[in-house]
């Protein structure tokens, strides 16, 4: 199963999302500190990221952008309770900060809390001005797969594809869903679209090709996909699962 995607922090522009009004100079200093912290987060330098965030928090102790960035640092360093606390502080300060909500939902997903993550992703998708909305629909679909809700997952992936027709993960998962529903023609169509945007197929992409070939009795395609999966990804869970299935 695919992992959900985290919304990337902007590199240099910070929208003020804090508590008390401040002077332009203080706001500029705050934005500079947050931007530096984000750069350090991007390269995995957690100590310098925290140092700059602490300095930013001295300027504005109730800034949602700072809370969110702290949350990502703590999540990356395995301090999950602190990460959750910081995510919740960010959303309490600015409930409309959809990037933070998306990243909190991704955090919940990574902790196996799929029902909670689904609710947060669903809220994110309601923000029609959020640039990461296609990704939020994708993540919502992945949540629903984990919750054994294929119809809901398909609805979410369809919305994601309506906004981004080249979303390889949504195309792939729609192929699996259509195959499981017995619609091999649609499964082949989605797999073909996936191959167009991802010529170097993932193990899961090759597995879908295998399963479609198996379902349609296409022995040539079956042999080709099995050979590719064995040669390219011999240690992958997909190849092991396929070989175990063949030995039954």
Model-flagged regions — what are they?
Residues 16-24, 193-248:
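Terminal, low-structured helical/coil segments at or just beyond the last alpha-helical repeat
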Residues 42, 76-77, 110-111, 127, ...:
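Register position in tetratricopeptide repeats
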Residues 35, 69-72, 103, 137-139, ...:
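Canonical tetratricopeptide repeat
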Residues 66, 100, 134-136, 170, ...:
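TPR alpha-solenoid repeat register
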Residues 25, 59, 92-94, 127-129, ...:
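Structural marker of alpha-solenoid helical repeat scaffolds
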Residues 6-29:
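Bacterial Sec signal peptide processing site at the extreme N-terminus
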